[in-house]
Amino acid sequence: MSLRDGEKLEIRFRAPSGRTADLTWGQQRMAQLMADLQPNNASLNLKFAHRIKPGLKADEVASAIRGMVEACESARTLFEPDAPSAQQRVTTEGVLHVAVITAVTATFTSALESAAELAGTPFEADDLPVRVGILTDRSGPAFVLLAINHLASDYLGAHWMTWHLRHVLQADFSDGEPSAIHPVDVSHWESSEAGRREGARALLRHERSLARMPQSMLPRLPVEPLHPRYRYVVMQTSAGAWCLSHLAKRHGVSETAVGHAALSLVLAHVSGLSRAHLQVCVSNRAGRDTAAVVGCLTQDVPTCVAIDDADFDALLRRSAGAIHHATLTGRFPHRGLMEVRERVEKRRGFPLDLSYWLNSRLFVPLPAEAPNAARIREEAARTSVRWLGGDQCSTSTLFCYLDRRDDILEVLMLVDTAYVAPAEAEQWLRAFESILVTAVLRPELSADALVAETGVVSFRATDDWVKIDHSWIHLPTTAARLHAALPGMTLRLAVETPGGEASLVAIVASPRSGRETSAPSDTVVVEALRGCRVGMRPHRFVSRAGDVQD
């Protein structure tokens, strides 16, 4: 078989099993995110480029691709997320059209660009969830390109999908083999009594985290965003990689926990808060039965750590505990988490801004050598920060990825420019590295001293701001939202501090002064604040005669 640029190979597949099931809990979360980003949710598609072993023929590569599709139910599942039931259907036969792309010299960079083109459009309901391409050059097939619908697989699931191509790829697959369990099996387990029990336990843990966290990690008002609004900035640091690994070894925690602590410290300092919360992407693969499933099991787990003392070691232990519990929490029904969140928001009086994320892909620790201050400083001088192109879509204010490229730590950050200025994002990345480096070179420093070394400026409140329930509340914004939601009520806001704890009081104009007046429905007020990250429901409504407006 010879390949020509622009042609499409037709790979016919046939498999014995054709099954249906509801979406798994992980798929439900992804389906909601896709709906939120409509009509342009292609940014969620996974994309990969894998180098082909030299000397292979095109028909050998095509045969391996056929074997992958036939072995992986996820690669031949059709999705209809809005259906009342059986939202995923595994097909038994069909045709996969493989794009052929020719280059004079195929490089990894050009392969990634071609994979991005494959992933550049959303998957339709009648599309197979995998697009495959072959990049060739004068020597023959050079790269297999994959674009995967995120409903079909997450990052780790894609690794096990490409395991089926191991005989034609140069990649190392010595860490095991895929599970015989498929997403349909996962969905059936989740609807079982055992699955419902595990989901209920997980939701109880998440409710405790949601009850502790600040309303938002960036208590600020939006500004006119740049175009494009959402932008990627990446830092590549050898010094950061080495120091992160050394801190993990020194304190007996995971590298992800160290990254979580450093990012939490930066955000809490920026915001002037004593707690930090992050949504952590958890693969749900701690169990032996789910470790190697080809599918989308990843869910976002809320974490919250206190940053109210001077001990950096304590912060590392808290982050390690948060990551440990998040990893072992287990799967949970996505709709159940939405209900828990609404219950907590109603109780606390404000909508939670859960748009700050950490996705760590630091799976294999880097060997940590003995500290060498001169080498660390030399490597830190080579750290690079650069902005990436492209028009991104997101629902996040800040999404941070931790990856390793050989001995380089890559910190990729997606920011919403309505809340984060480009110069700030760069400064926060540098601060992240600075905390890691300084914690290694000067282990006696406290957390406060470490973040002070970065030069990042902390939030400074004015008279318009008040800290209530570990969150910054903007009084003018809250008043404006209440006036819009309660048009028949004339009121102003006041802050009381009985027992030292601040509370928000709405003083309502009434002929009868000094009495508590009936408050509007908690649900009505919280919904009126939806989309506002710096407003809250008053704790009390008190009547007062005369004009009460500011």
Label each residue range with its predicted role.
Residues 9-18, 54-70, 86-127, 314-323, ...:
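A short, small/polar-residue-rich loop/turn motif at beta-strand boundaries
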Residues 9-14, 18-20, 40-60, 125-145, ...:
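Gly/Ser/Thr-rich phosphate-binding loops and adjoining beta-strand/alpha-helix segments
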Residues 78-79, 169-181, 209-216, 423-459, ...:
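A short N-terminal helical cap/helix-turn-helix that marks the beginning
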Residues 72, 76, 162-163, 274-281, ...:
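Extended, hydrophobic beta-loop-alpha segments that form or line the acyl/peptidyl-thioester binding
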Residues 1-37, 63-106, 126-128, 182-229:
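Short amphipathic alpha-helices and their capping loops
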Residues 18, 23, 29, 42-49, ...:
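Flexible, Gly/Pro-enriched loop and linker segments at secondary-structure and domain junctions
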Residues 38-46, 73-74, 140-141, 194-200, ...:
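His-Asp-centered acyl/peptidyl-transfer active-site segments
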